[in-house]
A protein has these predicted regions:
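...captures the hydrophobic TM-helix bundle architecture rather than a specific catalytic motif
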Residues: 1-274
Length: 275
């Protein structure tokens, strides 16, 4: 990347990509809501996948603009600090999202379900509303919402996927070291291995979801357990999907020689996100 004038903070021109991203989110969320509630609604799946397609176009289009500005030498140290702070806040927002839903899971598991079962100061709830209900976990509540279901064994695909992600953390670290040492071919190999591990994780998670829905009757309708399970694992899957897309972009950039040993925050930011 060329160097911008010291002290001159680059202000980008107006961009339509945020509007495109908003349209993608609207289509995806509306399509997903209809798909979940209406099943095979006429517009549910087409709208959902249209939103996904628009989002991918937005992602690559916006990447292209930012990469072009970087290669044109419009960014200086001030802009670099802004990018770093922006990425940190973005990752922090994801951490808070997960914290909120893990908090909901903890509340349901440790507090609300025992109360409904008559434990603690919630004994009257069981006595007057849900008499006869015995607290257990996992559960879909005293109303048996969604029917009886089974859980996914922890030592099956979940263990495999955990090992895949831990391995990908090692490979992306090796790739970063290869970049800093100027070993471009080794960088591409390790980065490619990380992408392959991420794609394999996504394949197995999709397989896991199909098994949950078709064989275990574990769905979004399976009470508090089903809803929190799919929210947490689904959002994590989205995180891995976005990370895999960004890693793929980084692979092509590295193949074109875009980064140097000392100037590679684009790569570093994706590595932060992946970890």
């Amino acid at each position: 990347m060329a160097h911008a004038t010291p002290g001159a903070y680059y202000i980008p021109t107006s961009s339509y990509w945020p509007l495109v991203g908003s349209l993608a989110m609207i289509c995806t969320m509306v399509g997903a809501a209809h798909w979940i509630n209406d099943g095979d609604g006429l517009l549910a799946r087409p709208l959902f996948f249209t939103g996904i397609g628009i989002f991918v176009v937005m992602l690559f289009g916006w990447f292209r603009e930012v990469i072009g500005e970087s290669l044109a030498g419009r960014y200086n140290n001030q802009v670099d600090v802004s990018f770093r702070m922006g990425m940190m806040w973005f990752i922090f927002s994801e951490v808070m999202f997960f914290a909120a839903f893990f908090g909901a899971l903890f509340y349901a598991r440790m507090l609300s379900v025992p109360w409904i079962g008559g434990e603690g100061h919630g004994a009257l709830t069981n006595l007057y509303i849900w008499s006869g209900y015995t607290a257990s976990w996992p559960t879909n509540g005293p109303g048996v919402v969604g029917g009886v279901f089974e859980t996914i064994p922890a030592w099956g695909l979940p263990l495999v996927n955990t090992l895949l992600l831990l391995s990908s953390g090692v490979t992306i670290t090796f790739a970063h070291h290869m970049l800093r040492s100027g070993r471009r071919k080794a960088l591409l190999v390790w980065l490619g291995a990380t992408i392959l591990l991420g794609a394999t994780f996504l394949y197995y998670q999709a397989h896991e979801y199909m098994e949950a829905y078709n064989e275990l009757n574990l769905t979004l309708h399976s009470g508090v357990y089903g809803s929190t399970f799919f929210m947490l694992t689904g959002f994590h899957g989205l995180h891995v999907l976005l990370g895999t897309i960004m890693l793929t972009v980084m692979w092509f950039r590295c193949a074109k020689g875009h980064f140097t040993r000392d100037n590679h925050f684009g790569f570093e930011a994706v590595a932060w996100y992946w970890h």
